């Protein structure tokens, strides 16, 4: 009987040790996962998620949607939200999410070292992952003086030659918000009114539509994000190559504040159930491998290191280093200025 009790005790001990092992941090790492809410829908991103899982064993559960819809969803889910990370485009949207209380502060020496201060929230609530520059694009054979800065687009020589997107477009809102911050509201108002006077047509279409309009001669100059140019440059379609051949690109304000840039970025959510994995994931997206893939796969500028792929052909440029959070802080003011200027 004593031997049987001893055997039973050993069995119970082994069972208890196994149960404790399954509850240990090591076990949670091997079975870890994170829930990502993303407004980016690029094959490049999907490849990164798969690579992250292969390297860490952490499964990425992806929920996709529009930026505003995802923000509203997280707010509606409240403390029970399964979201660990929100990724979205435009610093203004990231600022709005932070103002709504969606994010939590992240203290990461890795992110502090990799992400410049002007490309992250002042309180480390969100971090830039990739960049795009808003450049001036002109038709090479237009015969007009090549503009050197955004303010040049208000000059009378460009009367009826400027094509633009709608004022409600988030990239135009952030551009104007940046101008408000760096030049003041009065100067920003004059700029918006001057550009409206030079419109070749009613604002319409996306950035690619503006590029095609310039190439066709419908207008002579526009502004566009560099990754739209990169897509056309990387295209094998002869029609796209013909468009690119007719276009010239200017990085504005190289003798002054620098060219306006915007970002895609990520923040760890306030009630993230998998906080450690979420921070590890954001750090991974700023790694050399991930940054190179952003550049080569989606024609974006990396936060870390130099550009590669088609957009590298555009050359280096000076960036406006106003903190990207400004785009959100000044957005309401930008809306009012556009409205007063008649920019629809």
Which sequence ranges carry the predicted segments?
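Early extracytoplasmic/lumenal segment of secretory-pathway proteins
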Residues: 32-96
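Short beta-strand->loop
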Residues: 37-40, 122, 138-140, 145, ...
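A structural signal for short loop-to-beta-strand junctions that line the ligand-binding cleft
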Residues: 81-86, 104-136, 151, 163-164
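A bilobed periplasmic-binding-protein/Venus flytrap-type ligand-binding module shared by bacterial periplasmic
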Residues: 135-142, 261-274, 293
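Short helix-loop capping/hinge motifs at secondary-structure junctions, enriched
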Residues: 141-148, 180-189, 272-278
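Periplasmic-binding protein-like
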Residues: 160-168, 284-307
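Ligand-binding pocket segment of bilobal, Venus flytrap-like solute-binding proteins
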Residues: 178, 182-252
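An extracytoplasmic/periplasmic, membrane-proximal ligand-sensing/linker region
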Residues: 188, 299-344
């Amino acid at each position: 009987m004593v031997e049987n009790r001893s055997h039973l005790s050993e069995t119970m001990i082994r069972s208890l040790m196994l149960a404790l092992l399954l509850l240990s941090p090591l076990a949670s790492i091997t079975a870890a996962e994170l829930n990502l809410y993303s407004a980016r829908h690029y094959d490049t991103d999907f490849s990164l998620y798969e690579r992250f899982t292969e390297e860490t064993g952490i499964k990425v559960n992806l929920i996709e949607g529009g930026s505003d819809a995802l923000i509203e969803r997280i707010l509606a889910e409240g403390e029970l939200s399964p979201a660990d990370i929100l990724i979205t485009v435009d610093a203004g949207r990231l600022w709005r999410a932070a103002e709504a209380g969606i994010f939590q502060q992240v203290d990461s020496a890795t992110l502090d070292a990799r992400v410049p201060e002007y490309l992250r929230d002042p309180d480390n609530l969100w971090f830039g992952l990739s960049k795009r520059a808003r450049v001036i694009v002109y038709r090479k054979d237009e015969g007009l003086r090549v503009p050197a800065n955004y303010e040049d687009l208000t000059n009378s020589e460009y009367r009826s030659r400027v094509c633009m997107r709608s004022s409600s477009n988030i990239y135009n809102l952030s551009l104007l918000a940046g101008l408000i911050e760096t030049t003041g509201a009065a100067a920003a108002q004059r700029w918006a009114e001057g550009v409206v006077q030079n419109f070749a047509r009613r604002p319409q279409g996306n950035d690619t539509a503006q590029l095609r309009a310039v190439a066709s001669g419908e207008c002579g100059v526009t502004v566009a994000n560099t990754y739209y140019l990169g897509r056309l440059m990387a295209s094998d379609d002869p029609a796209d190559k013909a468009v690119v051949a007719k276009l010239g690109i200017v990085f504005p304000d190289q003798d002054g504040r620098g060219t306006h840039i915007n970002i895609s970025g990520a923040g760890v959510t306030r009630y993230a159930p998998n906080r450690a994995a979420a921070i590890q994931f954001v750090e991974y997206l700023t790694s050399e491998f991930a940054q190179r893939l952003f550049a080569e796969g989606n024609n974006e500028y990396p936060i870390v290191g130099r550009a590669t792929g088609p957009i590298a052909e555009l050359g280096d440029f000076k960036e406006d280093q106003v903190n990207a959070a400004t785009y959100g802080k000044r957005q309401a003011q930008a809306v009012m200025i556009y409205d007063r200027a008649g920019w629809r």
